[in-house]
């Protein structure tokens, strides 16, 4: 009792100090001092989802930039790895609803998906890197892929069972949807890379900046949901992401033409000025900035719709994420859904407005050297000589 009275007779300053420390969390309610408050707070921060997303985002962006500035074969490998991983994750969301044994399901998926992907993607790489040795292989590739697909198709139809038709046919449709879409996206990304590193990296960085800024702005000031099937996306984040993506797009364009950022042999054409008349005034703008504008609009307003489709697909199968490959982000498909559409757009825009198929002497020469053997070139020279002699006569 005496000790309790003594404690109660503590000075007001001591009581105030104790109360302040307790409010700060440095003294627990039972009176013990917590000495590792800072460490506990730091440990709590490192375990948050935001911290994991931040660290992994930095690692992924750094890795992508390193791959992009090195030999193109690394970029080809990245494209193949990402697209195959996305196909696996999309098909994987039907795992519990299919009802087939694991070995039969896996065999059917590989039998249907591999021939389609191989037929659409591998010729693009073979013609670029192995053109001299791949002619015989490419002539027979379509034959091998077709009959491999037919065999898998027959096995799939034979394995259909009553009572499971809906999920089994859903798997069949999802295999074709994912494989065709990813194969086309991979082929377009390879095309973009061959036209210049900038046209491979630039669209991807636009989507990355749009995705990050939409998340940050939405978390900070977002109040109005943007899409009912994706409630975490907000209208404020959508608008803020467009503003930030515009700034990033013009900054990357400026670095490309003025600072040597991902410069290629054909980059000089984008330094040329284009003249416009705006309200009676003559305006001169470098052509790169004109080409950048469509990419900004597609990355900000069109590419997110592929993300909305991915959200709808996950909800249809009652899944939160496509996978758990990236901690804090979900699966690879959750992060790459918008990249698919921008890669396809980039290839169509490049072939339509930038590198049109107008043959020149230099392009024909490069084509001959890339695709013909020494003996075939000598035969071609003899044919051209005979043609020249006939014209002179």
From Swiss-Prot:
It is found in: Membrane. One of its GO terms (molecular function) is phosphatidate cytidylyltransferase activity. The keyword Chloroplast does not apply. The chain crosses the membrane at residues 49-69, 73-93, 108-128, 141-161, 171-191, 198-218, 237-257, 290-310. Coiled coil: none annotated. One of its GO terms (cellular component) is endoplasmic reticulum membrane. It catalyses: a 1,2-diacyl-sn-glycero-3-phosphate + CTP + H(+) = a CDP-1,2-diacyl-sn-glycerol + diphosphate. Keywords: Lipid biosynthesis, Lipid metabolism, Membrane, Nucleotidyltransferase, Phospholipid biosynthesis, Phospholipid metabolism, Transferase, Transmembrane, Transmembrane helix. It comes from the Eukaryota. It is a multi-pass membrane protein. Its EC number is 2.7.7.41. Pathway: Phospholipid metabolism; CDP-diacylglycerol biosynthesis; CDP-diacylglycerol from sn-glycerol 3-phosphate: step 3/3. This is Phosphatidate cytidylyltransferase. It comes from Encephalitozoon cuniculi (strain GB-M1) (Microsporidian parasite). InterPro entries: PC_trans, PC_Trfase_euk. GO terms for biological process: CDP-diacylglycerol biosynthetic process. The gene is CDS1. Belongs to the CDS family.
């Amino acid at each position: 009792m005496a000790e309790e009275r003594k404690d109660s007779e503590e000075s007001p300053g001591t009581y105030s100090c104790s109360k302040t420390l307790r409010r700060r969390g440095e003294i627990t309610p039972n009176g013990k001092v917590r000495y590792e408050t800072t460490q506990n707070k730091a440990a709590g921060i490192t375990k948050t989802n935001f911290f994991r997303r931040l660290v992994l985002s930095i690692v992924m962006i750094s890795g992508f930039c390193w791959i992009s500035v090195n030999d193109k074969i690394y970029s080809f490998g990245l494209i193949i790895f990402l697209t195959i991983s996305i196909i696996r994750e999309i098909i994987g969301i039907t795992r519990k609803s299919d009802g087939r044994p694991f070995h039969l399901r896996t065999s059917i998926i590989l039998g249907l998906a591999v021939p389609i992907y191989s037929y659409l993607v591998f010729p693009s790489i073979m013609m670029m890197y192995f053109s001299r040795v791949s002619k015989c292989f490419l002539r027979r590739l379509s034959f091998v892929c077709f009959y491999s697909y037919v065999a898998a198709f027959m096995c799939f139809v034979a394995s259909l069972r009553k009572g499971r038709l809906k999920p089994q046919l859903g798997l069949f449709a999802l295999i074709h949807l994912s494989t065709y879409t990813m194969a086309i996206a991979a082929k377009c990304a390879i095309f973009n890379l061959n036209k210049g590193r900038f046209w491979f990296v630039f669209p991807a960085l636009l989507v990355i900046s749009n995705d990050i800024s939409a998340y940050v702005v939405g978390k900070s000031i977002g109040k109005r949901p943007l899409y009912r099937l994706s409630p975490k996306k907000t209208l404020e984040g959508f608008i803020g992401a467009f503003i930030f993506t515009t700034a990033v797009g013009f900054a990357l364009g400026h670095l490309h033409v003025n600072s040597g950022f991902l410069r290629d042999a054909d980059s000089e054409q984008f330094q040329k000025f284009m003249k416009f008349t705006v309200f009676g005034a003559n305006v001169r703008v470098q052509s790169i900035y004109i080409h950048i504008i469509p990419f900004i609009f597609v990355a900000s307003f069109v590419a997110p719709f592929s993300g909305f489709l991915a959200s709808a697909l996950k909800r249809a199968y009652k899944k939160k994420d496509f996978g758990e490959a990236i901690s804090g982000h979900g699966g690879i498909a959750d992060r790459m859904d918008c990249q698919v559409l921008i890669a396809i757009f980039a290839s169509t825009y490049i072939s339509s407005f930038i590198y049109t198929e107008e043959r020149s002497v230099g392009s024909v020469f490069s084509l001959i050297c890339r695709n013909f053997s020494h003996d075939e070139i000598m035969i071609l020279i003899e044919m051209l000589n005979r043609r020249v002699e006939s014209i002179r006569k």
